[in-house]
Amino acid sequence: MDGFELPTAIDISSVVGLIAVGIFTAQILLGLLLSVGYNPIRHWPRIRGVKLFTFHNWLAYIGLGTAFVHPAILLTSPTAGFHVFDIAVPIWSPTQPIPNTLGAIAFYLVAFVVVTSYFRTAFGRHRWKLLHYTAYAAAAVFCVHGIWADPLLKNRPPDFIDAEKAYVEVCALLIVAATIWRFSYGKRTHRFGRGRLSRSGV
């Protein structure tokens, strides 16, 4: 078809990155609900058979996999010029090394959260809870990466009202607002992290 161009590897990588941001946002929001003991059977929508803990865990695994695929796709691009080392340690990547490094740091932080959560019984509840706060750092760094990085890898300055950037900004604001609500709720009820967690909760 005339005028139709297939998306490039760079285009696909950008979309996958946005999907990862959405998954991590949903995962953190769900985690905040679980931390206050939310149960869809006892509370709205009062639906049985919904296992939020399992869903929370799988969101983390899927999000981590999506975040891995996001830069890995660039290895197939004939124009991006990325190699495996540029993905793993992007401080020397061919374009926008600082935003890319932030993205890599966010990925490693998420991986740390997922792995330590899977083996949380080995750490003990109190120590694991402290380690789990790394998720907030991961979210912050990931959002900064998403807002700062040029999705076309052309080192353009960020356009904060661009649709993609606005999407990341909204996700960041949702996380901030939900976190403020969570700690405000905790102060009112003296309930910090007492929600029931699954054996391998993430």
Q: Residue ranges of each PLM-predicted region?
A:
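Membrane-embedded alpha-helical bundles that constitute the cytochrome b-like, heme-associated redox core
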Residues: 1-202
